Amino acid sequence: MVVVSKNNEQQSLILTTELLRTAIFNISYIRGLFPVRYFKDMSVPALDLKMKKLMPMDAESRRLIGWMEKGVYDALHKKHLKKLIFYICETVDGPLIEEYIFSFSYSDSDSQDVRMNINITGINTYGGTLNSTADNSTADMTLNQMSSVDEDFGQNARRSNAFVTYQRFSVYISFHIANYRLCYFFASVQRTILMKLLYYEYVPPDYQPPFFRGCSEEEEAQYVWPKIPLRMEIGNVNSQHHVLTVKVKSVLDPYDPCEDENDNMQDDERSKGPDSLHDDQPCKVFTKPSKLILTENKDADHGEVNEEKLLLITPICEILQDVKQDQVEHQLAKVKDTKGRPASIVQNPILQSHEYDIRRLKARLQRLERHISVPDSPQEGIRKWFAAVSSQLFYKVMEACTRRKPILGDAILSSTVKVQNFNAKICSKLLKKPASIYRKKHFTLNSASLRISGLAGSIFAWAVGFCLFSAQIGHVFVQPKTRSSESKPKVTMEELEEKLTPPSSEPKSAPPSSEPKSAPPSSEPLEKLAVIRRILPEIFAQRCGQRNSSFEAFAQRRTTYDYYNIRLNPREIIFRRLQEESKVALALSSANYFVLSILYRFFRQWSEVSLVRRNSRLTGNPSNEAQSSRSNRIEIPTLLDEPDREGSGGHLAAPEDPVDFLAQFDPLIDLEDAYNTQPQYTEAEVNARLLHEDHVEFDLVPVVSWNTEITAKKTLSTTESVAEVFALCGSGDRPLTCMIPGENERPWNPPRGYVCMYEAYFRQCHLWFPIPSLIISFLNRRHMAFSQLTPAAICNFVAALTFGAEEGYLVNVRCFEEMTTLKAIRSPGYWVVNNRPKHNFLPGPKVSNFKNWEEYYFYVRVDLESYERPFSGRKRMWTEFPDRYRPSPDFPVEFEGVLEAIFRARRRTWKDVTRSRVNRIMGKVRKSFISFAAGLLNMPPPPAPIEEERQPLDGEAAASNPPVSAGPSGVDQVSHEMVNPESQDRMCLEGADVVPAQEIAECDRSQSVQVVEPEVQNITDDRSVVVYAAPPAGEEVNTGLTILDQDKDETVAEPGISRRSREEKGKGGANQSKKRSASEAGLDEAAAPKTFRLSRGETLNSDQFTFKYSGEKFLVRDQEAASHLWRNLMLPGTKDFPNPDDLVLKEGYQKFARSSLETAALANDLIATYDRKLKLKLADREAFDNLKKCADQAKAIYAKDMKEMASLRDAAEIHKAEMSSLNDEVKRLNSREADLQKEFSDLQVALVAVKEHGERECNRLRNDRAAKVARTTKKAQARLDRVKAYLKEQEDLVGPKVDAENQARGAEEIVGILMQRGAKIAASELSGLKELTKRATDEVNALNVIELGDDDLNMSPDQLGFSRQISQVAPVADQHGSNVDLLAEVIRRVSVEETNQTT
């Protein structure tokens, strides 16, 4: 671990970007924005923290990654970014659900220290405040404090990790875990994520990073909050040059206060307020009334609650389906109804201290413990037990958070002991037995669980104990409660499942009576655990109202989970099923659901390990899984795989090849061409893309247990044992590079460019180099390390490849996955590949018990010599959860052919799969043989073939024990078991060869020099790299099949090396024979019976004889019989050959005869192989003839087509001319179109000008007309005023005077008339009358009256100047009408009246 005190600007930028990316990706994971399979586990070994990394699985995930890496990082690198706001909305148009604000500030000062301050403060929805900080001594944490270590690495590392875990979970508990039930609802609905960037003022206005654009004010105002959000300030990280501050806003209610339970143990019901998450779905909820008062502060003097700060909250007792009802009014009405009811004031557990909550939970636990009794039903019993245990755990978590212990894991561990005692009390009450039995026997935590530091490990250990304890008491809840004192019979597993499984409509066949019944639940914990797994879903289903549904009904709802495209285990199906029902909030109390969410979070990964796919169903812990003889368990690290080299920009210089290069079905005609379909690489290309051979870098730290010791054991492999393995698998002529792990190296931390392998892969499983592409593709698809496979899995790979190659097929990975399943074994980290029941291509007994195979491992460099595909399947670190195989509805196209070919193979049992058979079929037949003349010259015997012994049956040990180094254990370097020559020395020419260990040892000693020449290169003090180079070109490698003499009892072990004792298995020393020799029995050794009989009969011909062999060995292995048979093989005319027993060179002749017969046997095998391939070639010739006929027909058709093509070419020329003319016309039309476009544009310009001119003229005429109308109106008004003045003058002034004058004149005329008629009037009166008339006339004449002209009297519009043209006026006969008739009538009436008066 590197201690860092100062960071440069580049390191500061990297730290800030990594923190930002981790925050965004973990928020996406916690809130369920993407499916779980889109995230990859990452870890920080220095801090023991696990994170989630979003992988580009689809367009949406790639888009979010592009926003971060190309957009946000660009602005951050240029120091333009001020704030990054990450929104989570319900829909595209809002409203907002959560808002994460990341603020950035930049500094060029190097004087600051790298610090992290986690201080959670916030304001809730109702105005209250919340705080969650560490002590003053640990509130701020520098990078040195996080990374520095001293000599006591284990203790300080655990304390530092526990502190970091506490800091992380203090944030998690105060905000995220309280919202955990809301996180799962995100997965069932679609959410919209938005990202907004704010820049500093100095940033250019036109700057926009990739994937981002400018935002208008209308768009910003579009997204609003549905209610007042909760505001929280998480803290800040100062990395010297960059300061990152995090704030959160959310409308999700983080508070989930628990209601006090009644004394009668009624179920807790959860109230639903107007701001609940489920208000968008109308439902009917019934709860008991309650009051909750959230306070911001208290009066310190009087201790009373401030009435102004109170907010009364009551549950909605019933929400009807009527959506028109105002929820606010409904809530206020409920407030009025509850005002008169007594209620207790409950303080919020997060706003106030935790002490009240702890006291409350203590009282609740006392009530639970007091009311625990034998349940009436299994549902009630499990509910009460689970409520009590979950409340106890929640209480301990809150107590540990309140006390702020330095190591939170120890506090939780101590709480688990109290949980154990509490559970024991419950169980003792349920079973009427002492509590000590269950406290000591069934709830003991394994020490391995203590190695996981922090709260996560403690909850994980508690979850494991919960399942084990549930398995032990599972049978209690199905026993009915009776008052009888008689002992209750134990319920078997079959009766348990029958009672818990709902009745089915289909009749079930009764099980045969011959099958024995299963043991009671208390006998097998694993079986009872499986029963509990089937019980819990049924209990939860009945708890949610699904009483008539079973687990199968839940599992069939696959359409709901097709969105995730993953295989869900039963527990995950049940949880997601519960999330679909809104009543789940009412079925469990708040504390129960809180712990249930934690258990689901941390217990899901543990449960998935033991669940695999078998016949499209999920099962747990099958009984036929491969077991291991390991006595110690290992902690599996979860690390990241790294490339060998990095190119520019951090990209891989050696990208991995496609996983499955055999995408199509590929039948093989010749086995030698089998591997031509894979990509070919040159040695220079591979060396350029991989690390250099001399470069060895151990970049992975070993896993340390709780007592600071490296887990697992050091390897027992040595350079000699690895050389023996290479020679055994026929790789002596390949320049392989291997490394023996040192004291601190284990299978999961090899150096870069190396992978770990076990010797059992090659000794017992017959694997070879280079590693086949099938295994590499399988590991690449599963993201597993090579060393995670068990030898049983390698056996299935080797058998599938061998059987397929015998029939001319190369098995690809897709077909292999359809025939097999991947399953975890009991040893953590190891996985076995088993055949499916319907596709069991390897029948018979399986070799599943490889003794101590995991103790012999070594590292091999990945190159062309060790891997067929050196750029794939190079994962070094182990993974806890390999990628599962997701079967498609249809099988691959080539599956049927490959499956039939494998099942056509002969001798498909594992004992028939031998090393010689594998070498011969997979193209590794030995090509050099020993000369028999070497034995005649008294030369050292040649090496014998290295072949495996026959595999044992019925669970016996493997053919050879793994070799170990010489030392205290005293185990032989070669360690092959001795085989009795008289009982087991048989050889099958087809491939089932068994060679005595004596010859194998001699062959090993001779081949240790001839086959390989190791070159040791010292790398460190305790490890070395061994390169096994090829022998010189001039030397011939003697790897023939000649067998040494077996009659001599020679010891194989070298001086100072002893064999492993097998007395514990009753097998004696080096496989002692049950038969005694003749000398030991006191008999004459020469009297041994003959194994053959030679008879010539009555024939005189020397080459006509009958040879009958009755020995237990094969003829080619019996030297005496072979020599007598060989001596009778003579040419015509030759003399009889002497008896071989009388020869001087008897032994030499016997060896020669035996070698000759072996050569003949090999020739027979060679001819048979040639005949088989020749038949294939003949079949190919027939196919070639058919192909030739087809080719001739194709040529004729081609000639006919050429003739037709000539005519078509002529037509094409004509069409070309037409096309040319049409192109010219198109050009002319295009030019005309351009002219018209120009003319159109000109006309548009002219139209605009005309419109402007028309508007100007219209305005001018309108103004002129308005002025003229104004003038005309003024003129008419003036005339009218003059006429009015005239009329008034006439009426007021002129009229009276004129009337006086008229009266005077009338009087004068009347007097004149009277005087003419004889009347006498005085002269004075006449003169006075005249004077009066004259005076009146003078007055009238003296008047100056207004005179009206014709223009003044004419009021016509024509005279006023506001008239239309004459042509526009229609002629009218009497325009103004006439009153002649009226006047005439008036005149007649006046005249009549005058006449009457006159008369």
Swiss-Prot record:
Residues 267-281 have a biased composition (Basic and acidic residues). The keyword Coiled coil applies. It comes from the Eukaryota. InterPro entries: HORMA_dom, HORMA_dom_sf, HORMA_MeioticProgression. Pfam families: HORMA (PF02301). Gene3D superfamilies: HORMA domain. This is Meiosis-specific protein ASY2.
